């Protein structure tokens, strides 16, 4: 444990998508920095707004720790489909039918059918929910039933293989290396996965949190994307926050401290902070239970995906809140951390991350339960149109949900 003192601190630590265990996020990406700031006075905005990406390589086993994103550009030329006949889907799931043997008239190009004006280029949340609906109805195309086809046969016939190679060659190569399936001659399989956190630490127009001198930029703040990020706009936010805004606003803040000497770390405040961290780590290490941090992370991921994933409802969210509380209780009773306490210990670090994820999950569920409307990446089954699409309620919910930490085992306070 090391001490650092600073006149100002910038968090650029990414999102909290790995609360779902499986996501497209890097393995080292976690919500711990933002969460610890939240517990020390920085407010958290819109935690329930997370984006699910429609074009990811499907889950293919119990030992995966990460999902692979296939670029959304593939939907420019690929056509998304599942079989029209349930018996064909069952054969695909059993591995007894080649998708190339299904004639066009027996293929359901469901995005083109439902959204003729947009076809396969509908927004990410729409494409993701549509894929889930088809798979939930039994039309999934792999052995888990959790995949749909993204087919380039028609684009190759129309444009030629050379053009498709020029546009997507690196993506096709990556797909074949991972799946051992040639996407030039066979349709890709895709399925939605957690991708981006629109929620994050609340910041003002200067990118400062509610803790003076603490800034949050990029995905770890809530500021730019509302309820649903558009493709490539994370790059825009990185440029806006890190290049155009922060150098000026943090400079203005530091100008008032120009005469302040170097921050000393041998103070009672630093002593208390270090003791708090050490005590927490020692508590985790000394549980001496039977289950690994990964076990609890996977269990949390199942709860999140099932009840706080693409489609949410009050009953499921209330159930999730109860299940998360039960998981937290079990975590602090039956966690086992291997290795030495005083040495570099990846399992102990992981345990700390999972402890934070469990608390983040609770806040996400509270926020999703409070927002009884469908908006962007947040889809409530109680708030849909006659066609089954998202139905917003701007009269009652056109606000940023800003949550304030009130202490361990206490409900946070919502500011609108």
What are these regions (language model features)?
Residues 330-416:
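C-terminal amphipathic alpha-helical interaction region
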Residues 1-8, 210:
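Core beta-strand elements of the Rossmann-like FAD/NAD(P) dinucleotide-binding domain
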Residues 8-63, 67, 225-248:
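Glycine-rich loop(s) and the adjacent beta-strand/alpha-helix scaffold that form part
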Residues 107, 222, 235-244, 368-383:
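Conserved phosphate/anionic-ligand binding catalytic regions in large, soluble enzymes, centered on
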Residues 36, 43-177, 248-251:
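An anion/pyrophosphate-binding glycine-rich loop and adjacent beta-alpha core
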Residues 51-60, 189-197, 258-280, 377-389:
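A glycine-rich phosphate-binding loop feature that marks nucleotide/adenosyl-phosphate handling sites
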Residues 252-343:
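Long, amphipathic alpha-helical stalk/connector segments used for oligomerization, subunit docking
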Residues 194-216, 220-221:
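FAD-binding beta-loop-beta segment adjacent to the flavin cofactor pocket
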């Amino acid at each position: 444990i090391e001490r650092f003192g600073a006149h100002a601190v910038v968090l650029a630590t990414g999102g909290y998508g790995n609360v779902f265990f499986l996501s497209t996020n890097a393995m080292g990406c976690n919500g711990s920095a933002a969460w610890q700031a939240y517990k020390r006075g920085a407010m958290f905005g819109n935690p329930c707004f997370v984006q699910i990406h429609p074009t990811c390589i499907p889950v293919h086993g119990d030992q995966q720790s990460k999902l692979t994103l296939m670029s959304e550009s593939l939907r420019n030329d690929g056509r998304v489909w599942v079989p029209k006949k349930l018996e064909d889907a069952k054969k695909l799931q059993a591995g007894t039918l080649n998708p190339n043997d299904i004639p066009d008239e027996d293929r359901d190009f469901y995005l083109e059918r439902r959204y003729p004006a947009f076809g396969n280029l509908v927004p990410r949340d729409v494409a993701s929910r549509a894929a889930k609906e088809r798979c939930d109805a039994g039309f999934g195309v792999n052995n888990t039933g959790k995949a749909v086809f993204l087919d380039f046969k028609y684009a190759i016939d129309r444009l030629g293989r050379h053009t498709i190679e020029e546009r997507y060659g690196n993506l096709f190569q990556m797909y074949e290396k991972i799946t051992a399936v040639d996407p030039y001659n066979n349709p890709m399989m895709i399925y939605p996965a957690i991708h981006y956190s629109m929620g994050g630490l609340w910041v003002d127009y200067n990118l400062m949190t509610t803790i003076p001198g603490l800034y949050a930029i990029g995905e770890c703040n809530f500021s730019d994307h509302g309820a649903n990020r558009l493709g490539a706009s994370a790059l825009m936010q990185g440029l806006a926050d890190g290049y155009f805004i922060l150098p000026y606003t943090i400079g203005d803040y530091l100008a008032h401290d120009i005469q302040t000497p170097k921050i000393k770390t041998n103070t009672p405040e630093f002593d208390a902070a270090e003791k708090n961290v050490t005590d927490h780590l020692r508590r985790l290490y000394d549980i001496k239970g039977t289950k690994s941090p990964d076990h609890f992370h996977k269990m949390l991921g199942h709860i999140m995906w099932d009840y706080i994933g693409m489609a949410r409802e009050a009953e499921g969210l209330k159930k999730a809140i109860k299940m998360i509380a039960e998981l937290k209780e079990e975590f602090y009773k039956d966690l086992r951390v291997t290795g030495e306490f005083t040495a570099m210990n990846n399992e102990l670090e992981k345990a700390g991350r999972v402890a934070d994820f469990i608390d983040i999950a609770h806040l996400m569920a509270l926020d999703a339960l409070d927002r009884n409307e469908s908006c962007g990446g947040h889809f409530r089954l109680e708030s849909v149109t006659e066609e089954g699409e998202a139905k917003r309620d701007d009269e009652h919910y056109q606000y940023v949900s800003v949550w304030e930490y009130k202490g361990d085992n206490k409900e946070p306070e919502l500011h609108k």
